[in-house]
């Protein structure tokens, strides 16, 4: 039995040895797994360290820039970076152009004082513990700096900054309110009333008469002008010739022609004394010529006048007889 066990012992040893791994291959696999894990952990640590370093550098840069702006604003020299003029003419709040230079120079420039600004804010029931910040350069106003406070909205800025801004804009940088109040439109011009006036002219100028007065009245109604000539009637007693002349308009024309001709004859006789006649025969010739001219004028008027009633015809003949006499 012992022998059987001894015989079975080697068999069992062989089976166990065949089933268990070799001691040389196990440490090699463990070493390979350990190297890969170490590389992964190292890569993660390197990336995390790089991100942390970048964040720290960015924070330091922002702090340094903020500190530099604060230092330059309190030093009094080169205290603010000048705002760059925009290439556009209007910007967001512009109206196509800046403020007129004359208006810009008329805006008041004051020396800023924090105590004065705090007192003014207290009177207006406003809390202004942080002071006034210029919206153009994003820096606070310090004591002794020149500042402009816009008249309409009351916002304050550095004088240089707001002058540069208003050179290309016409509104406040904060509230976009126009700096200058636009002028009110002009009221419409009322239409002129119709003109009416009276001009008195002597009748001798208008009709060649010397014993009457005439009035010329110009009246404007609905945009049209009308000339009215008024000839007053004579206060003397009327004669049959005047009655006949009133009954017929052609006789009135004839009288006008006769008087015009007589005035022209008197003017010609007065201007040239050498043409005056010394004999009675010459006077007779002048009377004949006068009668012929009057007859021709009467015929011309009768031809131009339409048919008249018998009474008017008789009056015209009577007037013609008087004229010839």
Curated annotation (Swiss-Prot):
GO terms for biological process: cell division; protein ubiquitination; root development; ubiquitin-dependent protein catabolic process. SMART domains: RING (SM00184). It comes from the Eukaryota. Keywords: Cell membrane, Membrane, Metal-binding, Transferase, Transmembrane, Transmembrane helix, Ubl conjugation pathway, Zinc, Zinc-finger. GO terms for cellular component: membrane; plasma membrane. It catalyses: S-ubiquitinyl-[E2 ubiquitin-conjugating enzyme]-L-cysteine + [acceptor protein]-L-lysine = [E2 ubiquitin-conjugating enzyme]-L-cysteine + N(6)-ubiquitinyl-[acceptor protein]-L-lysine. A zinc finger (RING-type) spans 134-176. This is E3 ubiquitin-protein ligase EL5. It comes from Oryza sativa subsp. japonica.
């Amino acid at each position: 039995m012992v022998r059987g066990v001894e015989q079975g012992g080697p068999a069992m040893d062989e089976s166990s040895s065949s089933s268990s791994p070799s001691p040389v291959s196990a440490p090699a696999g463990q070493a390979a797994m350990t190297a890969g894990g170490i590389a992964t952990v190292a890569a993660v640590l390197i990336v995390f360290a790089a991100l942390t370093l970048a964040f720290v550098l960015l924070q330091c840069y922002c702090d340094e820039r903020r500190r530099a702006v604060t230092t330059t604003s309190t030093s009094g020299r080169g205290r603010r970076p000048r705002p760059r003029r925009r290439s556009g003419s209007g910007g967001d709040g512009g109206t196509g152009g800046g403020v007129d230079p004359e208006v810009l120079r008329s805006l008041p420039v004051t020396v800023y004082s924090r105590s004065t600004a705090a007192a003014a804010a207290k009177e207006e029931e406003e809390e202004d513990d942080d002071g006034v910040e210029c919206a153009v350069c994003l820096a606070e106003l310090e004591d002794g700096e020149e500042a402009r406070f816009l008249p309409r909205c009351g916002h304050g800025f550095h004088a240089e900054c707001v002058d540069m801004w208003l050179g290309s804009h016409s509104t406040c940088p904060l509230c976009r309110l126009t700096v200058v109040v636009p002028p009110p439109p002009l009221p419409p011009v009322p239409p002129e009333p119709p003109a009416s006036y009276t001009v008195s002219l002597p009748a001798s100028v208008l009709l060649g008469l010397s014993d009457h007065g005439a009035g010329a009245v110009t009246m404007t109604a609905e945009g049209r002008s009308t000339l009215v000539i008024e000839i007053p009637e004579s206060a003397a007693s009327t004669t049959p010739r005047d009655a006949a002349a009133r009954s017929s308009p052609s006789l009135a024309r004839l009288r006008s022609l006769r008087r015009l001709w007589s005035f022209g004859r008197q003017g010609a006789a007065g201007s040239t004394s050498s043409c005056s006649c010394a004999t009675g025969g010459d006077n007779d010739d002048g009377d004949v010529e006068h009668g012929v001219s009057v007859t021709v004028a009467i015929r011309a008027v009768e031809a131009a006048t339409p048919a008249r009633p018998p009474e008017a015809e008789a009056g015209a003949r009577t007037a013609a007889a008087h004229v010839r006499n």
